[in-house]
């Protein structure tokens, strides 16, 4: 990927994001996270030069490699994949900006225990399976608020900052929209408990996600 292509692609995405957010409100701010799991470190550097600053990885070892390769750049790294318990210590040592995929109370308790042992804190989002899909991770919508509150109470070394969900994996836009609206409703309930981020939408559906309140 050369800089010209990266700039063109990024500009197209920013234009779409701007259009979607302004249809809600000029005060609705949206942060773009570039998912770099299929990109090389060189690609990430090119995107950085084009203006992108935040990137997401779904494997701990890939995150480690790219963080080491691009150590000189002021990048913001998010972990967005399924976190296996045997990788928790490795992820803690990398100190990502945000773990977007905290998908159960059980995982939160294990993460908190290991954070306490290292005297560290990490920010995270609770992942919600709003599409009720067996292939997706996350807590079910009907227990999400309660699980969020339990993590706040039981896991002082995890700084919860909101929720994340992946839209329904179907062609029907109405069904995808419903899954996003379900997550947004939960997010709204959690704002009084400190939730700041409602992370929804991928390359195929981010405009719809923003229309439903993703930020």
Regions found by a protein language model. Give the residues of each.
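Conserved alpha/beta-domain cores
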Residues: 1-204, 212
């Amino acid at each position: 990927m050369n800089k010209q292509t990266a700039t063109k692609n990024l500009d197209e995405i920013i234009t779409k994001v701007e259009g979607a957010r302004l249809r809600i409100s000029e005060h609705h701010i949206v942060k773009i996270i570039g998912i770099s799991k299929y990109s090389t470190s060189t690609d990430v550097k090119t995107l950085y030069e084009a203006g992108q600053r935040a990137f997401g990885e779904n494997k701990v070892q890939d995150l480690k490699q790219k963080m080491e390769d691009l150590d000189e750049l002021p990048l913001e790294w998010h972990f967005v994949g399924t976190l296996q318990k045997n990788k928790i210590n490795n992820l803690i040592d990398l100190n990502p900006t945000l773990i977007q995929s905290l998908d159960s109370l059980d995982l939160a308790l294990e993460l908190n225990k290991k954070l306490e042992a290292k005297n560290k804190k990490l920010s995270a989002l609770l992942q919600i399976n709003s599409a009720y899909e067996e292939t997706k991770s996350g807590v079910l919508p009907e227990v999400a608020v309660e699980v969020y509150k339990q993590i706040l109470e039981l896991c002082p070394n995890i700084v919860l900052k909101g929720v994340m969900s992946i839209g329904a994996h179907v062609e029907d836009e109405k069904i995808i929209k419903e899954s996003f609206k379900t997550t947004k409703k939960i997010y709204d309930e959690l704002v009084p408990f400190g939730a700041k981020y409602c992370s929804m939408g991928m390359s195929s559906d981010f405009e719809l996600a923003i229309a439903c309140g993703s930020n």
